[in-house]
Structure formats: structure tokens, C-alpha cells
Amino acid sequence: MSALNLTVRVHPVVLFQVVDAFERRNADSHRVIGTLLGSVDKGVVEVTNCFCVPHKEHDDQVEAELSYALDMYDLNRKVNSNESVVGWWATGNDVTNHSSVIHEYYARECNNPVHLTVDTSLQGGRMGLRAYVCIQLGVPGGKSGCMFTPIPVELTSYEPETFGLKLLQKTVGVSPAHRPKTVPPMLDLAQISEASTKLQSLLDLILKYVDDVIAHKVTPDNAVGRQLLDLIHSVPHMTHEQFTQMFNANVRNLLLVITLSQLIKTQLQLNEKLTFLPTA
């Protein structure tokens, strides 16, 4: 498959690691680079992990600690053997003169390595994210070169990552003086209440869109219509009594689990106090 047909999907943990490496950089370092880890399947490069590679850039050369990169990759393989080298990343909003030299090294580590740039300077008020592949250029018998060509890049996440991001959003906009050091997980019933409220708001948004389309206030979108049709077909067919019975049964099970967990928590706390109780 041609490198131009690749699509890059980046997980949030990768961006967090890039920002953390940029914040911990040496005082004389203008940018940070590192290795991208993940997998490639059917033209999709999924980047799930990364690590920083110490380096120094001079006017005419680049010095990188390649032995450190190999050791970090070997350690990561022991933890997750499914992740392999898929490319490299760098902070900044564009490709520099040294990028082709660094890319040559990663071209020996994997086929069609991707280059990911993360704009940690937040130009335009947002963190720019771009992905490139290197295309060889030249004529037969003449000089050859390479050109970094942009390819599609998008953010994706697993369900646990999405849940973690929602917890992080609870502290966004809170001043550092009042920001809590920890965010405890919500109780199960509170999660159900929050999810129900969000579901209700989404349903209201869908109903408003449908009403506007019927009233010719909004131009209909065929893609949205197909998604709504798939959503309707995904709803299980059951009567109101069946749904109420199923919902009540699930609530009873949830309350039973909460009660048992609280009893276990109380028993552990009591056992801890009895263990450290001074004996006469």
C-alpha cells in the first residue's frame, strides 16, 4: 500500500507524553523528539504509545542517543509485545532541516514511518497536530531527495481513556488555588444520573434537528439521516412494561452491589483499626 494512503490515529496518552517530555526538556533544547509506538492495519496507523529520545541539534548534524531508544523499545516490548515502532514525533508546527536525517533512521526501523508534529507553542490557541510521510523524489541516474507530504490524522480513544478525559475535564477552568489535588470516582448512582441527563440533552438536540428539517429550517444531511436510521434500528424492540421490568432489575442489582461493597469497606476499616489497637 502506498504511504500516501495511510491514515494516522493518535490516542490521548501520546499527546500527554509529548507535552510532559516538552515540559521536562533541557533549558537549551528548542524542541523534543521521540519514537512512536503502535500498530498498522489496513492502511491505518494507530499510535498508542511513545517515548522521548534525548538528542542535540547542530547546524550541520544531529546527535541522538540511539542506544537509549533501543533500550526503551526493548523494555516496552516486555510490557506490551503488540506495540512496534511506527514512526517518530517532534514538537513544533513544521518540518525542519534536520527532519530528513532523523527520518532516515526510523526508515530502517520500520516500513513507511510516519512523522507526527505537535505544536506545543499553542499557535492559534490550540495544539496543532499534523502527520507526514516521506516521499522519495528524483530522476533515474540523477540526484534524489525526499519530501514530507501531509496525510490525514485524527484523534481516537478507548473507553477507559474517554472516561479518564471526562474526569480531567472536571478540573478545567478551576483556579489552581481551588483546584482539587484528586478527583474521586463518582458513585454508581451518580454516574447513572449524569449519563441519563446527558442522554436527555442529546435526545433533545436530535429532536430539534428533526423538527428543523421537517420545517425546512435546516438543509437535510443524508449522512445524518443514515446515522439516525441506524440508531433507531439498534434500539431493542420491547414494550414499556418489559423495559420497566428490565430497568428495575438492573437497579436492584446495582443497589445490591453498592450495599455489599460498602459492607466490605466497613469491615476492612474495622479490621484495620482492630489490628493497630494497642494491647494491654
UniProtKB/Swiss-Prot annotation:
Species for this entry: Drosophila melanogaster
Lineage: Eukaryota, Metazoa, Ecdysozoa, Arthropoda, Hexapoda
Pfam families given in the database record: JAB, MitMem_reg
Superkingdom field: Eukaryota
Biological processes, Gene Ontology terms: antibacterial innate immune response; defense response to Gram-negative bacterium; formation of cytoplasmic translation initiation complex; positive regulation of Notch signaling pathway; positive regulation of peptidoglycan recognition protein signaling pathway; translational initiation
Official protein name in the record: Eukaryotic translation initiation factor 3 subunit F-1
Cellular location(s): Cytoplasm
Assembly with partners or alone: Component of the eukaryotic translation initiation factor 3 (eIF-3) complex. The eIF-3 complex interacts with pix.
Protein family membership: Belongs to the eIF-3 subunit F family.
SMART domains: JAB_MPN (SM00232)
MPN domain location: 8-138
Main location: cytoplasm
Gene Ontology cellular component annotations, sorted alphabetically: eukaryotic 43S preinitiation complex; eukaryotic 48S preinitiation complex; eukaryotic translation initiation factor 3 complex; eukaryotic translation initiation factor 3 complex, eIF3m
